[in-house]
Amino acid sequence: MEANASVDMFSKVLENQLLQTTKLVEEHLDSEIQKLDQMDEDELERLKEKRLEALKKAQQQKQEWLSKGHGEYREIPSERDFFQEDKESKKVVCHFYRDSTFRCKILDRHLVILSKKHLETKFLKLNVEKAPFLCERLRIKVIPTLALVKDGKTQDFVVGFSDLGNTDDFTTETLEWRLGCSDILNYSGNLMEPPFQSQKKFGTNFTKLEKKTIRGKKYDSDSDDD
């Protein structure tokens, strides 16, 4: 009896919340419709022109990004290319990888998807064997590592999978959320709610540049499949 009463009470509370939300949405729509009804022809024309201008600017921005190599996940051949690519784009994600590290291939699959979804960000990959100077300069020790570059400066790193739930089975949405936390792409979800369920266990402490140390020239792998 008590269990049924609790369920009924919860259902009523949920129903009331849904009704209140629906009412607020309807009121907002009514308000917007009323504003449009009160506009004269000149005001409607100005509104139309404003929206067309916004669409035009958005299309121009998209074409500019595409011309700079956004919209695809590309490999760059050398350290010199890394610096040149960073100069051209405001937001860059670069995957420092090694062919023999299995987890790098996992990241590749997710980065291909995100590169097509987030045109505002450039997605690159660079073989650590071809970038010894850069890896030392950025203090990259664990493979894979994502370097997150904004306005030509390295702002943050995603080292291994510790920020992604410590699992090889993390979703593209989890990586998207993590990159959104560093403002390296436009994240539309709630940054306070990580997509992976094990948030409490692993926490949300991210690896920062100042926490890195150089311990020799050999790279450590975050994967057991070396």
Curated annotation (Swiss-Prot):
One of its GO terms (biological process) is microtubule cytoskeleton organization. The modification Phosphoserine is found at residues 188, 221, 223. Keywords: Cytoplasm, Cytoskeleton, Nucleus, Phosphoprotein. Residues 52-180 form the Thioredoxin domain. The keyword Nucleus applies. GO terms for cellular component: centrosome; cytoplasm; midbody; nucleus. PROSITE patterns: THIOREDOXIN_2 (PS51352). It is found in: Cytoplasm; Nucleus; Cytoplasm, Cytoskeleton, Microtubule organizing center, Centrosome; Midbody. It comes from the Eukaryota. Gene3D superfamilies: Glutaredoxin. Significantly diminishes the chaperonin TCP1 complex ATPase activity, thus negatively impacts protein folding, including that of actin or tubulin. Forms ternary complexes with the chaperonin TCP1 complex, spanning the cylindrical chaperonin cavity and contacting at least 2 subunits. This is Thioredoxin domain-containing protein 9. It comes from Bos taurus (Bovine).
